[in-house]
Amino acid sequence: MPGLLRARRTDAVRLDAVTTFHLRHGVEVADALRVGRPVVALESTIVSHGLPRPDNLRVAREIEQTVRDAGAVPATIGMVAGQLVVGLDDAELTRLATVDDVAKLSVRDLAVAAATDADGATTVAATSAVAAAAGIRVFATGGLGGVHREAAQSFDESADLTTLARTPIAVVCAGVKSILDSGATLERLETLGVGVVGYRTRRFPGFYLTDGGFDLDWSVDSPEQVAAALAAQEQHGLHSGGLVVANPLPTDEQLDPALHDRTLAEGLMLLRREGVTGKAVTPFLLAHFHSATEGASLAVNIRIILRNADLAAQIAVASAARQA
């Protein structure tokens, strides 16, 4: 396939029925996978599209350090010059954080991006698929994509959901982004057979908010319980999909609910007025939150991803211990 580069630590990996990609592993990640050390996958979209500069690069490094501090190896995934990299080094991370034309890559975009030697940041869907193909079972992100509001008219639903239906990975998140339809997203996850467990809660979190307003059937109380669930899934062989681990913010760290609701209503009105659709919806609304809350939402967003990175690392450590 044109545009694919070969470098150290390169493996051919089949992501679907028709396309074979070459994954280049960072040295630290390759060594960790070889000897069975715990590894946590991290997305790169938060670096290139999710956070403003210069916070994006600083926070990306903090996320990786949080994973290390909890005993695991971070594997930030992205595409550099057409090649999928599992474990971006600091120069590659800096490149995706500072270059202006970094593409936002879901699973469907990977082939064309590779063929055109593109730089790209992977979404939850693409990161999950690549991580699972590389043998990584735990992934930390901020919020899951989901069913958009008014999806009955727009059919706008994140590929995160259908990808998780066929991808064996645990995704630690603070629920779905509160700009989405949480109830409809939970219904779709149920239909698709994707497990959802609350971490020390029976309520689905609302990203910026501790409580998103919906009950959950299952709750786990420790990283070891999540690791046991992943092991049972693999051993029983009854389901090859993902597991959403919903990790809510403590109530004293959430965004003020009244401010959240007011900002969301204003953002949705602006969205309709300006005709924003598709991939542009989420970054548009997140930017509105950042502006309207005078940076408060950004601070909450950063706390979310750091807390999720820490929990994901603990789960990866517990999973590795079970296999030792």
UniProtKB/Swiss-Prot annotation:
Name the UniProt key words of this record, in alphabetical order. Answer: Glycosidase, Hydrolase, Lyase, Manganese, Metal-binding
Sample GO molecular function, one term: hydrolase activity, acting on glycosyl bonds
> So where does Mn(2+) get bound?
D156
Per the entry, the cofactor note is: Binds 1 Mn(2+) ion per subunit.
Gene Ontology terms describing biological process: nucleobase catabolic process
In terms of domain of life, where is this protein from? Bacteria
Q: Which residues form the active site?
A: E43 (proton donor), K177 (nucleophile)
Q: Does the keyword Manganese apply?
A: yes
Reaction equations catalysed: D-ribose 5-phosphate + uracil = psi-UMP + H2O
Q: Where does substrate bind?
A: K104, V124, S158, A159, D160
User: One GO CC term of this entry?
Assistant: cytoplasm
> What cofactor does its activity depend on?
Mn(2+)
State the top-level EC class. Answer: lyase
UniProt xrefs under SUPFAM superfamilies: Indigoidine synthase A-like
> Is the keyword Cell cycle in the record?
no
EC code: 4.2.1.70
Q: How does it assemble?
A: Homotrimer.
Q: Which HAMAP family match?
A: PsiMP_glycosidase
Q: Which PANTHER family does the record match to this protein?
A: CARBOHYDRATE KINASE PFKB DOMAIN-CONTAINING PROTEIN, ZGC:136858
Function in brief:
Catalyzes the reversible cleavage of pseudouridine 5'-phosphate (PsiMP) to ribose 5-phosphate and uracil. Functions biologically in the cleavage direction, as part of a pseudouridine degradation pathway.
Know the name of this protein? Answer: Pseudouridine-5'-phosphate glycosidase
Native species:
Salinispora tropica (strain ATCC BAA-916 / DSM 44818 / JCM 13857 / NBRC 105044 / CNB-440)
Whichever gene encodes this chain, its name is psuG
